[in-house]
Each structure stands twice: as C-alpha cells, then as structure tokens.
Swiss-Prot record:
InterPro entries from the UniProt entry: Ribosomal_mS23_fun
Listed GO CC annotations: mitochondrial small ribosomal subunit
Assembly, per entry: Component of the mitochondrial small ribosomal subunit.
Species of origin: Ajellomyces capsulatus (strain NAm1 / WU24) (Darling's disease fungus)
Segment forming the signal sequence: none
Biased composition (Acidic residues): 244-269
One Gene Ontology MF term: structural constituent of ribosome
Pfam families per UniProt: MRP-S25 (PF13741)
Name listed for the protein in its UniProt record: Small ribosomal subunit protein mS23
Subcellular localization, as worded in the UniProt entry: Mitochondrion
Family stated for the protein in its record: Belongs to the mitochondrion-specific ribosomal protein mS23 family.
Amino acid sequence: MGRYNLTALRVRRTALATTQCGKPGTRQPWLDVLADIPPASILVRNQAPSHPVVKQRMRTVPGKSKPQLEIKSSAGRKQTSKKPSRIFQPKEIRYEEDQLRKEFFRDHPWELARPRVVLENDGNDHRRYNWQNIQQPGKKLDGESVVQRQLYLLNNVPDMSKGAAYEIARREFYQLRLQEDVERRVAQEEALATGAYFGPDMHTVGMELENQEYEKWKVWAEGENQAMEQRLAAFTGSTGPTEESGESEDEIPLIEEEDAIGASEESETEAPSGPPI
C-alpha cells in the first residue's frame, strides 16, 4: 500500500497470531468486539474545503418599506496552477475586514508603529463593543477601530458603499486624533506652568559632559605626544622625513662592500699613468 500505515487495521490479526504461537498471556477481551466492529479504513483523502468570504449588506428594494438584508458569499479566485504536493494543504481563512484592514494600513503605515494592547480579560471584549461610535470605552483608538467602524457601516447602513464607509470612519478617526493632540499639548503646557521639566534626564546630561571632557583630553594627549616625539628627536638627532624626497635618513639604501671594491678597482685601471719621478 505504499506509505499508508495499516498497523491499526491489523491489530486483531496480530493479537490472534500472538495467541496461536503459544506466547504466555490470556486472550484479550476486545478481540471479539474488534471482529464485530472493525475500525474504519478510509484510504481516499479529500481536499480541504474552501472558506468563502461572507458579506452582509442592507439593500433598498423597490416596493418594500424597509431595507432588506442581503448576504453574499464569494469563493475568491481559483488557483488552477498548484503543485500536487500542495493540493491537500488547508485553505486560507479569509474575512471581509482583512481587505479593509489592508487598505487602511496601506494609507496609514505609521499607525502600525503605535503601541497596542492585545491583552484581554476573558477573550470576549469584542462582544461588548458597539460600533455605532468609533470610540469605545476601555479600548484605545487605533486602526482596528476604523476597520470595525467601517464594517459596521457596511453591514447596517442601507446602500452604503465601501468608499463612503471608509471616508466616514476615517473622518471620525482624524477628529479624535486631533482632539488627543490638543489634550496632550494642553497637559504639557499645564505641567510646564506648575514647574515640570521635560528636558534631557540626568543620564543624558552626564553623557554629554563626559563626551566634552573626553574631547578635551584627546587634544591634550595629542599635544603631549607631539612634545615627547620632539624631545626624543633632539637626543637621537633625527629630523624626520624630508619634504622633497619623502625618505628619512634611516631609509637611505646602503652600498654593499663588494660593489664599492669593484668600483675602486675600475677607477685605478682607467686612471692614466703619470711620468716617472
């Protein structure tokens, strides 16, 4: 059967073979039950079911006094080219607010940098929220508030489009953000008026003073090092590298002894002989 594991289906056969071989032990009481009710053997693997996106809308129907609830489900795009090894993988679970959340954070990427509180008491905080208003008690205003407010407008306001719901939720979000900024500035001005200090802390000031002292010591150390080199040069007689050639006296190449002897012999042979005395 290839890689299928049929060990569980052959438990009764293995137990009977063990008993017939004469191994010590009593006959298991579940052998007869297993013979009457064998385990299920499903060798056909079904593909994972897809999860359609369910959308709820309120539509105005001609001839009706009240808007009618309309529920649509879309399966999404079909993936025709898929590897055989990925056919049986679980399908992605998608919700309508996923696309709304993607659009909002695409327009407001810095909202992701704000700290968020994801801790809940019992996991049912979302059931106590009423998204008729974007601001909820006990919940900090963030991008998720805009998404849930937009979804509420789409599900409960008749003939509401996604763009119009996004504009309404976004306008309310901007107004509350502006109100928070004003409250923050007013609180800072009140604190400054009562003697609060919002400058750098003690550690930052200490590090700045330490950096200044280090720079002063660095200039003093360079001067001391230069004076020490000048005193050593006065004792050794070295004047340092020349400016024209760029070579010091210690780096002047020395003439080897053999070359000097050969040069003196050549000069003696080439010199003319004078008159005898």
